[in-house]
Each structure stands twice: as structure tokens, then as C-alpha cells.
Amino acid sequence: MNKINRARREFLQIGAAAVVTVILGNLPKNGFGQSPPNVTKGFVVHEDEGLHILTSRRKLPMNIKISKTNNGVNDISFSVEDMSVGRKMRVHKHLNNDELIFIHKGEGTLTLDEQTIQVKTGDVAFIPRGTWHGLDNTGKDNLLMIFQYSPAGFEEYFIENGTLVGMPAKEKTEEEYAIAEKKYGMVYKDSNASK
């Protein structure tokens, strides 16, 4: 595929993510459509900006673009994770947050309650709070995942337990992780924290 077609496809994929965000932003009673009183002007977070962290136990890179703490946005967050080939996300659920996952690039297998669904570039998954889910990169290349929580807040789990890129890694006990998981309403389906 030539560079023009690739650039066009990436532009359309990003546009699709924006359309989904706008549509869901206007749905009633799910937290997306309410503007926080302290955010009165729009803003842009550029490609190289955001909070670049290494996640808690496995020290995987992610970029939190919009968060409750850093941007004052209460109703939705926005993050990006580049999942390496073979990476498996533990099956878990969020008790307090709905989640949207957009597969910007790559392919994988999404667990959604008892279903196993193949996903690829351009696919979007809506995961209501309380739904078991996980994502495995089964492709030959990295999987670029864009994800959002509504209401915002769960991204703070990554901030609290992760490490800013370039800083010494935070070391926590399994008991400390369990306390944070309870605080942010995350439950793992299995009890093996080393996964």
C-alpha cells in the first residue's frame, strides 16, 4: 500500500474514533453527555503530549491523553496503549466505569463476558461497567489500542500505580495493588496477579 493510501486510511480511522466519541457523547444517562463545570474551553493534546507512564505490575507503556486529575474532565478519559505482539491483557471488569476500546492498528482477540471475538483495525468495542473483558494481541505486529472510560476516573489507577517514563519504577506489594484495585473498582477474573 502506498503512503497516500496508508495516510488516508489512518485519517479515516481516527475520524471514525472521533465520530464514535461524538455519538456516545450525546447519549443520555451514561455520563458521556455531561460537561464538567470546571472545563469551559476545548483543548488539544498533541501526539507527543499526555502522561507517558509504564503500567503497574508489567511496566507496559501507555499514554494518558485526557484524565480527570490532569485535565479536569470528569465525564470521559482518553488513553493510548501500544500492545506488543503476544501481549495478553488479564480478563477483568470495572465496577464504576464503562469503557470504549478502538483498535487503531493491528488485530487481536477480545474477550467479552463469555464471548471470544476477533478484532482488527477500525473495530470498536463498548464494554459496560461490570462486564468481563480482556484483549490479546494475536497479530504479527503491535496492536495500537485507544480506550476511554466514562465517567473519567479509572485512568487514575494507572497514574497512581504506574511510573512516569524515565523515573525509577514504583515497587508495590500485591496487597498494595489489591487496595488500589478495590479503590478504583477493578476485579480480575482470575486471582493470579503475576499474569
Residue ranges of predicted features:
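Double-stranded beta-helix
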Residues: D136-K195
